[in-house]
Amino acid sequence: MAETETTADRNVEIWKIKKLIKSLEAARGNGTSMISLIIPPKDQVSRVAKMLADEFGTASNIKSRVNRLSVLGAITSVQQRLKLYNKVPPNGLVVYCGTIVTDEGKEKKVNIDFEPFKPINTSLYLCDNKFHTEALTALLSDDNKFGFIVMDGNGALFGTLQGNTREVLHKFTVDLPKKHGRGGQSALRFARLRMEKRHNYVRKVAETAVQLFITNDRPNVTGLVLAGSADFKTELSQSDMFDQRLQVKILKLVDVSYGGENGFNQAIELSAEVLSNVKFIQEKKLIGRYFDEISQDTGKYCFGVDDTLKALEMGAVEILIVWENLDTMRYVLKNHTTDEEKILFLKPDQEKDKTHFTDKDTGVEMEMVESCSLLEWFANNYKKFGSTLEIVTDRSQEGSQFVKGFGGIGGMLRYRIDFQGMEFNDDDPDLYDDY
């Protein structure tokens, strides 16, 4: 369970960065006062601070007064942000500062600094009329890490593939006796010795796989591909010696004509289609499980904004499933006469109706305290409700059905909830007076 939770948390981080990239790419400024700064892990904050001080000196010579002041202001903002860090975080640091022009033509200051969800091995400093997000986009493209085990009669190779980066983790050679018809009375003994050596070889591969592909008691790869000539790979996948936690991660067995690095390259080519569909398959499985709950009428499911939020408040939602393009907005409104706060969830077509933003009794317009998309609010708060957040697309058949049929929001519950009974009870305020 813990392993799936980390995958889900990672997917939420990825969604947040995608959203950030979208808003940063759309932003434009006057002049060259928009600074993009990326510091890789193990770099020194002091080096970057010195570089910014030098840049400040250079920028003081810009002829245009307006541009000069805005560039100097942006550099000062970046320097202030850097003072918050004693050292560069383990995954590096990304800073965006500058003055952007909004759709209404007003100027707005933007200061963003964060540590990415995985190491960013890029060093960048640019002053431009836009923010540079290429390095962040690259960070998203190669997210899943896959393990490869290539076995043949001469030895085994262990490697990983992440995006376009392949890495050989370990390899060793073996000297296995070949089959032969000699030996007379000892032929059976020779065959037994041969089988024993094969058995030991498979055991060594299984033990090495645990050392390389399991950290902190959970697999560190999204999936495993077993490759090789002959039937070693099949023997390994069916063997009791192969760790159960890795067994469930096997995506494909592929036949390759070579061992070693050449076999590794061939295995990557042959399994490319399976690897590209992993996210897709996980999503299909998840929504399939959700549909199973509904078809079996277990009562351990919810859909629609209202029911899902009720179940969240009760701490009943185990897995919260939300479509990545859910357009519902969350508003917090305040009535100044009574000091009461009211929370609304509106679709784009409902937002145009201004009666939602006025008090029904007095007709007074309420002040908007907070507004953000419901999905963004979920992404920031789902852990408070003890849930796992899964953000899905509508590209699979199941995903499309989930969006069209269930409004793109739903959840799998820890226990059964009678929503109709709750609605009935809500109408009767005296019901709970005795408790």
Swiss-Prot record:
Cross-referenced InterPro entries: eFR1_2_sf, eRF1_1_Pelota, eRF1_1_sf, eRF1_2, eRF1_3, Peptide_chain-rel_eRF1/aRF1, Ribosomal_eL30-like_sf
Gene Ontology molecular function, alphabetical: translation release factor activity
Pfam family, one: eRF1_1
Protein localization: Cytoplasm
Keyword tags: Cytoplasm, Protein biosynthesis
An annotated GO cellular component: cytoplasm
Predominant localisation class: cytoplasm
Family: Belongs to the eukaryotic release factor 1 family.
Subunit structure: Heterodimer of two subunits, one of which binds GTP.
Known function: Directs the termination of nascent peptide synthesis (translation) in response to the termination codons UAA, UAG and UGA.
Protein name: Eukaryotic peptide chain release factor subunit 1
Source organism of the structure: Polyandrocarpa misakiensis
